[in-house]
Amino acid sequence: LMSEILDTALVDPDDDFVETVARRLPILMISRVLGVPDDDAAQLFHWADSVVYHADPEFADVVFDRDDTDPYRLLPFRSPTSVKVFEYAQRLAEAKRIDPAGDIGSLLSDSDDLTAQEFNTFFLLLVIAGNETTRHGLSHAALALADHPDQLDRLRADPGLMPSAVEEILRWSCPQLHFRRTAQVDTELRGVSVAAGDKVVTWYISANYDEAAFVDPFTLDLGRSPNPHATFGGGGPHICLGAWLARLEVRVFLEEICRKIHRFHRAGPPVRIRSNFINGLKHLPLELEPS
């Protein structure tokens, strides 16, 4: 799949790497895991963008024409587009009950343990988490390799670096900037008292560039070891459910890049998503020089 995407991108006149490459692999992968038809994937993930990028005018569907937004209170990010995703999820669940397959959508729709609302919200979670962050990880990877061509040459010359290269790309890109946690017990963290029930924001991006944890953290080093990055949450019960799928996608991406792409060349400035939650690129003009 990644090979086909790159082959298409190499002959595609559109130089926006996000559109031609980075968004396509995770969209198709998570769609197939969930049992979503390929033809529905683009629309579904357009809705997902509208939900999660609520602070960016290019994507947002924030409600401005009413004072009372309480009807949206229980929707993710208070986004009305969530309802469209929920409606799609119910149609998919009904179809899977009639004609099940070996996908996650079929397994979840056949479960008596989930209410319709729980199925809807879990489906939306998988659509967002299985797509958005990996897309940005791949975009940041391409930008990093455009700016550090020596590292691409190094990886191509020594494929044994692939495991450490994957982890370094994950550390470097850190698509999820932060998450909030709730302290379960009274504790103390580096001299700061934290009471049970306190909300604590964990800044993954800060941890990934912590000079106390990494040697030269602002240097891209595809052979970095050890690499105790916090991109997936740093461990514990809240570690990212899709960590292994994300690692697989990054690895396949790098393997195919080494085979097919000699160089990435910047064709314009990258455009960031307006968000303090997601470290994302919505446009990345790159020229791809084939091997």
Regions found by a protein language model. Give the residues of each.
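Cytochrome P450
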Residues: 1-291
